[in-house]
């Protein structure tokens, strides 16, 4: 069984990947432009990252996998599971969102301001262009309609924190619109996988054991 991690690596490998690697075959690829993965020339979007995951699994002869995604990784996982349901054994979505409105305004507003500033200087600065691409993911993506989630056929665990940057009603909407989904809310913020690793891993273990 294999997992997909988010584009935010801090703590995730240490607290989640390490926990599962003794019982499962865990693969944690970096999305394009992150870690050791080249940026390439394709669009820097959640849809493209989903296509990249498809290519990655095909190239590594992985016919089917349990996919775990955090934040943008959860958004990639949703897109992937909708388009390639036959390649998903189960889905674990931690801190994902359907659109920018799912993010609490207190968090989203600084992101939007930063995006506008970075975009303004993008043509004159490689660093600003990189920041514009990163922030653009949180401003312009993933744009998933709730009804589209019905295309996800795999058993799904949706996880969030009680003080998550994603609105709780938005997370509940995700769980309610995926046919075979269960919801787990853990005390903590957006980074419960790191800060509340025991509770997080316990929920994931319970879910995987039920498959």
Task: List each model region and its residues.
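Conserved alpha/beta-hydrolase "acid-adjacent" motif
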Residues: 165-170
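Hydrophobic, aromatic-rich cap/lid helix
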Residues: 122-147, 163
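Conserved acidic catalytic loop of the alpha/beta-hydrolase fold
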Residues: 47-65
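Catalytic histidine-centered segment of alpha/beta-hydrolase-like enzymes
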Residues: 189-201
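Conserved HGGG/HGGXW glycine-rich cap/lid loop of the alpha/beta-hydrolase fold
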Residues: 1-36
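Flexible "cap/lid" loop of the alpha/beta hydrolase fold
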Residues: 75-83, 89-118
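Catalytic histidine neighborhood in serine/cysteine hydrolases
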Residues: 175-191
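Short beta-strand/loop motif that positions the catalytic acidic residue
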Residues: 152, 158-160
